[in-house]
Amino acid sequence: MPQLDTSTWFTTILATITTLFILFQLKISKYIYPSSPELKSMKSLKHNTPWETKWTKIYSPLSLPLQ
């Protein structure tokens, strides 16, 4: 059986890791980050829903009269 030549593995792995690192750096550098992030007020996020203003009753099957 022939011997497996592993002499180029180090170079291949090193080149792959370097290439991936450069690609990820280029990808991350294209993002635009806000200069000063601010909290949004919670009052502007409140939605009016129809069931908040009126009273509703939920009937569970056990509370219904027996037939």
From Swiss-Prot:
One of its GO terms (molecular function) is proton transmembrane transporter activity. It is found in: Mitochondrion membrane. Keywords: Acetylation, ATP synthesis, CF(0), Hydrogen ion transport, Ion transport, Membrane, Mitochondrion, Transmembrane, Transmembrane helix, Transport. It comes from the Eukaryota. GO terms for cellular component: mitochondrial membrane; proton-transporting ATP synthase complex. The chain crosses the membrane at residues 8-24. It is a single-pass membrane protein. The keyword Cell cycle does not apply. The modification N6-succinyllysine is found at residue 54. The keyword Transmembrane applies. GO terms for biological process: proton motive force-driven ATP synthesis. The modification N6-acetyllysine is found at residues 54, 57. Its main location: mitochondrion. Component of the ATP synthase complex composed at least of ATP5F1A/subunit alpha, ATP5F1B/subunit beta, ATP5MC1/subunit c (homooctomer), MT-ATP6/subunit a, MT-ATP8/subunit 8, ATP5ME/subunit e, ATP5MF/subunit f, ATP5MG/subunit g, ATP5MK/subunit k, ATP5MJ/subunit j, ATP5F1C/subunit gamma, ATP5F1D/subunit delta, ATP5F1E/subunit epsilon, ATP5PF/subunit F6, ATP5PB/subunit b, ATP5PD/subunit d, ATP5PO/subunit OSCP. Belongs to the ATPase protein 8 family. Subunit 8, of the mitochondrial membrane ATP synthase complex (F(1)F(0) ATP synthase or Complex V) that produces ATP from ADP in the presence of a proton gradient across the membrane which is generated by electron transport complexes of the respiratory chain. ATP synthase complex consist of a soluble F(1) head domain - the catalytic core - and a membrane F(1) domain - the membrane proton channel. These two domains are linked by a central stalk rotating inside the F(1) region and a stationary peripheral stalk. This is ATP synthase F(0) complex subunit 8.
